[in-house]
């Protein structure tokens, strides 16, 4: 499927951060045309149906749940992960960065969204290590 968006200066984090064990397809900018913009609330390691925590303190497992939630919400809106144009990643400990980004990379391989990462002092629940919000533009 052709990319519905124009992605500028694509790169892979294995090149930009060779000292880290990462493999994320990202880009510097995304231009969209038409379509519907889907703004995702920051997704956390909990069920979308009942807000129950997943009960893991492993950053990779938490990130899998966060990315599954993101994928599910985009699909419920009629899109796919290829329509993801931006993510903002919040982590509570810089030591979790590689695990979080490696796991996220499994979900965005070939997508190349723009990405911003922040280390924050805390998230809404003490057990949460990662939160990711996203923006998708789904073609009409």
Region roles according to the model:
Residues 1-85, 92-140:
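N-terminal presequence-like segments and the immediate start of the first folded domain
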């Amino acid at each position: 499927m052709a990319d519905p968006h124009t992605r500028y200066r694509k790169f892979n984090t294995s090149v930009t951060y060779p000292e880290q064990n990462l493999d994320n397809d990202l880009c510097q900018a995304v231009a969209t045309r038409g379509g519907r913009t889907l703004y995702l609330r920051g997704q956390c390691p909990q069920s979308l149906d009942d807000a129950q925590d997943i009960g893991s303190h492993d950053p990779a497992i938490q990130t899998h749940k966060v990315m599954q939630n993101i994928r599910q919400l985009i699909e419920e809106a009629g899109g796919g992960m290829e329509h993801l144009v931006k993510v903002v990643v919040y982590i509570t400990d810089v030591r979790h960065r590689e695990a979080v980004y490696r796991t996220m990379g499994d979900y965005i391989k070939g997508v190349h969204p723009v990405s911003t990462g922040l280390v924050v002092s805390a998230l809404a629940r003490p057990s949460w290590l990662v939160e990711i919000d996203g923006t998708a533009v789904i073609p009409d």
